[in-house]
A protein has these predicted regions:
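Bacterial Sec-dependent N-terminal signal peptides
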Residues: 1-25
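Residue-level detector of conserved, function-critical positions
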Residues: 24-521
Length: 521
């Protein structure tokens, strides 16, 4: 072989090896651990059951079902995935692809808002709108503000004027267009306030003097000396309640006063409680109110009526569980029932809710446990006690965590730095920066010796040790050796991805010297 050719091949191979020496090898298995294929990518991201991203060097690709590059995503990293939109970041900004592969916005924007059939992009105070139905991008101009509402309307503001560029009357201006968590936009014109549906049409004409959103599709207003409770509707909004008596809406509490006296607790579309003698109402939770009366009684009111009947000798009643409600008297807490009777006298500085017939209580600084009869189960010697589930509670003492049973006995003699409960009753534990796993009876199934541990499902635990990743089951048996950089699992498609570094094989082509026959001696 020619010597110059040999040198040229060696140079090319050396260059190729130096360029690819950082490549990553991925092996794809099914969930029965049968090898399906091998892939060469630096990174693989599973964004959804059907959207997979591969990165090789500076090239980012949307992958096909067989994990081959199908569409180049142009950018260098995935900025965000908001189904069905893939936002991609590049040197000059953010752009967008549809998950089917179509690039719809170049990578040059600062911000992109998404909706299932449109995108709103901006650079500084300039805005562009992409509409998938028309497959086009429209320049909206220089604006002070623009947004997509949760119903898909576009609201823009320029100075003090608002408009809806996608409505049937895009040039119409408003004094206010306000989005909320309901399905209707609150609009204001010189004639008053109204409500606009997702098509951009009025379902409540703009004639209301004042109007504000309360919850969902409900609104509180005032017009022509009447207080109004209004429910939005796609065709025509309905006035659910109206009154010439004063209705206030402050701190998420709606009250009606008759002749200056508190008479009714209101809900979004009508009367929740009509009673005489009320002096004040305080909100203590979602749709929960403490109602105070002139005769010094206090009751707990819920969405469907009294949760705790008004009772004496109580200052506050909290939401409860298992038929018992934490309540305070003279600064101490105990428990009352729904009839307004003390079941456990007020004697604690603080209590938790009952769970599986047990609750935690605090005296001064430390916590203990009582049962639903008020009997002490565990002394107040704990810094923290979490609710009982399946007969066990997580408790903290001297900065360490323990598992506590319903007899007040700890199941682990040596404390952990932290304990996390899994959804099916197992416990992830940490000690000295290492993780392990306990079963539902607090028995060790995986020793506390891993830097990371994630229980994907029963008998499939992804672990990290010494910078490498593997999979073990709950008996400690190795399923996938702890020898990989990363492991990804796609249960929906029956795939397991393992990542490993590799160094390409160096191929040397050496020209052997020509052999000459020697003459015999």
């Amino acid at each position: 072989m020619n010597k110059n050719f040999t040198l040229l091949v060696s140079f090319i191979l050396t260059f190729f090896i130096s360029e690819t020496s950082t490549a990553q090898s991925w092996e794809v298995y099914n969930t029965q651990l049968q090898l399906q294929s091998r892939l060469i990518y630096d990174e693989i991201d599973l964004l959804s059951e059907t959207v997979r991203i591969g990165k090789r060097g500076n090239e980012l690709s949307l992958l096909s079902n067989d994990f081959k590059p199908a569409v180049s995503l142009v950018g260098t990293e995935i900025y965000q995935y908001l189904e069905p939109w893939i936002l991609v970041k590049g040197p000059n900004g953010i752009g967008a692809f549809h998950e089917y592969g179509q690039q719809v916005l170049p990578l040059e924007y600062e911000k992109i808002q998404t909706y299932f059939n449109m995108l709103l992009a901006s650079k500084g105070n300039e805005y562009w709108l992409f509409q998938r139905g028309f497959n086009k991008t429209t320049y909206l101009g220089e604006l002070d503000e623009a947004k997509i509402t949760n119903t898909g309307l576009i609201i823009i503001r320029k100075g003090d004027e608002y408009s809806m560029p996608l409505s049937t009357n895009p040039d119409k201006t408003f004094e206010l267009l306000s989005d909320n968590d309901g399905e209707f936009v609150l609009a204001k014109e010189p004639s008053g306030f109204g409500l606009i549906n997702r098509e951009g049409d009025y379902v409540l004409d703009p004639i209301i003097e004042t109007l504000q959103h309360t919850h969902g599709n409900f609104y509180y207003g005032f017009n022509q000396d009447q207080y109004l409770l209004i429910e939005g509707n796609d065709i025509q909004s309905n006035i659910r309640y109206n009154s010439f008596h004063k209705i206030t809406f402050e701190n998420d509490i709606m009250l009606e006063y008759i002749h200056g006296k508190l008479r009714r607790v209101m809900e979004d579309d009508g009367i929740l409680l009509d009673d005489v003698g009320m002096t004040k109402v305080e909100k203590v939770g979602k749709d929960l109110y403490n109602v105070y009366f002139r005769d010094e009684k206090v009751g707990l009111l819920g969405k469907k009526g009294w949760l705790v009947q008004p009772m004496l000798e109580v200052e506050e009643i909290k939401n409860g569980s298992e038929g018992l409600f934490p309540a305070s008297s003279n600064g101490a807490f105990g428990f009352v029932n729904s009839a307004g009777t003390w079941v456990i006298p007020a004697q604690y500085a603080e209590t938790t809710l009952f769970s599986e017939n047990f609750a935690a209580y605090r005296n001064t600084h430390n916590w203990g446990v009582i049962n639903s009869s008020g009997e002490q189960v565990a002394n107040a010697s704990w810094e923290e006690i979490k609710p009982f589930q399946k007969g066990l509670a997580i408790a903290k003492a001297n900065g360490k965590y323990f598992l506590l049973n319903t007899f007040g006995t700890t199941l682990n003699t040596e404390g952990f730095d932290d304990i996390y409960r899994t959804t099916d009753g197992f416990f992830m534990v940490e000690r000295s920066g290492k993780s392990g796993l306990l079963d539902s009876e607090a028995k060790e199934v995986i020793p506390t010796e891993f830097e990371g541990l994630r229980r994907e499902r029963k008998d499939f635990v992804i672990v990290q040790k010494d910078g490498l990743t593997g999979v073990i089951n709950e008996t400690g048996e190795i399923i996938i050796p702890v020898a990989y950089e990363k492991i990804l699992v796609d249960w929906a498609n029956d795939k397991i991805f393992t990542k490993n570094s590799f160094t390409p094989t160096v191929i040397q082509i050496i020209e052997e010297p020509s052999k000459k026959n020697k003459r015999g001696a």
